[in-house]
Amino acid sequence: MKALVKREANKGIWLEQVPVPTPGPNEVLIKLEKTAICGTDLHIYLWDEWSQRTIRPGLTIGHEFVGRVAELGSAVTGYQVGQRVSAEGHIVCGHCRNCRGGRPHLCPNTVGIGVNVNGAFAEYMVMPASNLWLIPDQIPSELAAFFDPYGNAAHCALEFDVIGEDVLITGAGPIGIIAAGICKHIGARNVVVTDVNDFRLKLAADMGATRVVNVSKTSLKDVMADLHMEGFDVGLEMSGNPRAFNDMLDCMYHGGKIAMLGIMPRGAGCDWDKIIFKGLTVQGIYGRKMYETWYKMTQLVLSGFPLHKVLTHQLPIDDFQKGFDLMEEGKAGKVVLSWN
């Protein structure tokens, strides 16, 4: 079968022929229909410092997907061949304190598909049946293909009550863009998104952001004054940029709450005085709550949330290089690759 493989320990990704995997007793073989390129996949493609520490060359990458059940393991019940599914990309142990306590998204033994084990950029893949999520007929496959990052955005946006609140989102990548849309969809007052990429800021505006701010050209404080704001009630940090995070701390209202998804560089500092004396709450966000986030994000789409607005490119798998080039250049929202 075809698969996108990180064959060599340098920049690039390779379309190769690899064996079709065989499902174990509790696994399902999935025939992929569509997959989406994630920021993590771009890191692996670029072979940055994180990738060099984490990725084993020879790995089939990818973790955002939709497909159909092709074969059931001998012990699998509750699914049928032909059903359309996506899946939670974090495989958890099931026996640690957090798994047994109803917090599997915090499992310290998590294995990530397309990072630690072979992933979804292939014609077929195997997944534990317990990780599957059935996709309703009303949701098109090109949207279901990126439910994974949509879930990250939903986890962040729903972590704190944003109804009637002023929300600051630092980072207009696809997750930040989607989070902006969710916050407006559920009733935030003002949603302000910052970045330095005008293309992606426009996508955030199209998704419903009240104001988008290119911080290389415009002061966030000036925007706050224009909106008659004393400070932001909720912050969603998506950029992983220390300067953006410190700007957020500076602009938060006393008692504000921050959900952090962006991964900061090692040793990055922040103004702890602002966290302490403003009484801020800072909550780290990892993955999606299993499976409450999946339920809520599915219902959001079914209720009219315009997830399609972040989808900018659909390409056949043979044009995968164009997709990675668009992502590297910052000229895309979500890029979906078709395996049909």
From Swiss-Prot:
Query: Where mainly located?
Result: cytoplasm
Residues annotated as binding Zn(2+) 2 are 93, 96, 99, 107
Where, in this chain's numbering, is NAD(+) bound?
Answer: 175, 195, 200, 261-263, 285-286
Catalytic activity, per the record?
L-threonine + NAD(+) = (2S)-2-amino-3-oxobutanoate + NADH + H(+)
- Where is the site Important for catalytic activity for the proton relay mechanism but does not participate directly in the coordination of zinc atom? 148
Quaternary assembly: Homotetramer.
Fetch the HAMAP family from UniProt.
Thr_dehydrog
Into which family does the record put it?
Answer: Belongs to the zinc-containing alcohol dehydrogenase family.
Name used for this protein in its record: L-threonine 3-dehydrogenase
Q: Which organism is it from?
A: Xanthomonas euvesicatoria pv. vesicatoria (strain 85-10)
Upper classification of the organism: Bacteria, Pseudomonadati, Pseudomonadota, Gammaproteobacteria, Lysobacterales
